[in-house]
Amino acid sequence: MWWRVFGLVGGAAIVALTIGAWIWLPLWLIVAAFLSGRLPGRWRALRLLWLAMLALTLESLVLVSLLGLWIGSGFGLWMRRPFWQWAHYDCMQWYLRNLFREATRVLRLRIVTVGPTPEAFPGDPLLVLSRHAGPGDSFTIVNALMNTYDREPRIVLKNTLMWEPTIGILMHRLPNRFVRPDPRPGQDLRSQVADLARGLDSDDALLIFPEGGNFTPGRRTRAIARLRHLGL
């Protein structure tokens, strides 16, 4: 499929970009130090540079790991077996844990969780409905599900996210669904979500973003109108 080719080419480009970024790091440090003296906040440009370098490096390490997992699973032959599925979830969890740990330390990111504790639903799968609130919120909720609630998420994603190589490769190897905001004739969105919900284990969580984009009053009104048109 086209996403495999794009994932291979895009993944190689990200790894090459990461190597180039590290080679030119002394120059970036000089530029960031210069800008930090002219921007508000304490060493803002240097902190953003560090987080960008970290994100690139983590993504490259994940891509290399995904290649290794593909080879180790018999070039994808055993990819759906429990061990290899767990290995992919572990890779995803490691990436998010390190990214958010550094974001908390470097950017003073603070995430407050309210509601039931992780022990509130022992042995039960979860259905999680989330509202988009801005950049990074999807990563935030997935990180909370994996590293706070110790869940393996099954996610309904917008199909445009397949263009991001790491997301496209990793999400296709795990039980997730990429959907179009305007399904083509013959595409039953409800059936796709229902198929994804079947067979949820005790440590699984089905994550859905019903609005499909950042919240606006107009988008909410249109979503309600679509549901009424469907008789829901």
Segments (PLM) and residue ranges:
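Soluble catalytic domains of membrane acyltransferases
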Residues: 89-232
